Amino acid sequence: MALAKIVYASMTGNTEEIADIVASKLEELGLEVQVHECTTIETEEILDADLIVVASYTYSYGGDGELPDEIVDFYADLADLDLTGKVYGVCGSGDTFYDDFCSAVDDFDVMLGSRGATKGAENVKVDLAAEDEDIVNLEQFATDLVAKVNE
């Protein structure tokens, strides 16, 4: 059974809910899933996963989209890992009020791809909290990831 590790950062609970939606669908599709809040996992612990999912909100103090403080170390440590042979997906929440809507999702997409991992699904960006359409998109995201893992 393939192992998926989901690492998330959530301030308001919205991104944690996103991670839980993805985790539920991955489990339904037959993967073993471990969900970790980003401060409770060392970055190298993702190396035993077949699928890596990062879910992060974008912090926009003053309108400048930034990675949340609590996930910065995880992000920086990714630069030291070889993720060749791993499949990844990135999702997260943000606020469309800001020009940099969900830029943390884009940052993680670039980083994971640059470390040799294979993108398994298009990024999913959620405006604030997951609504019905977002849930459909997140479940499709999970389905696409499993298809890539099973190739």
Stretch-by-stretch model annotation:
Residues A2-L3, G13-E17, K25-L29, Q34-H36, ...:
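FMN-binding flavodoxin-like domain, especially the glycine-rich phosphate-binding loop
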Residues Y8-T12:
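Aromatic-flanked redox-active Cys/Sec active sites in thiol-based oxidoreductases
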Residues H36-E42:
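Short acidic loop-to-helix transition motifs that present clustered carboxylates
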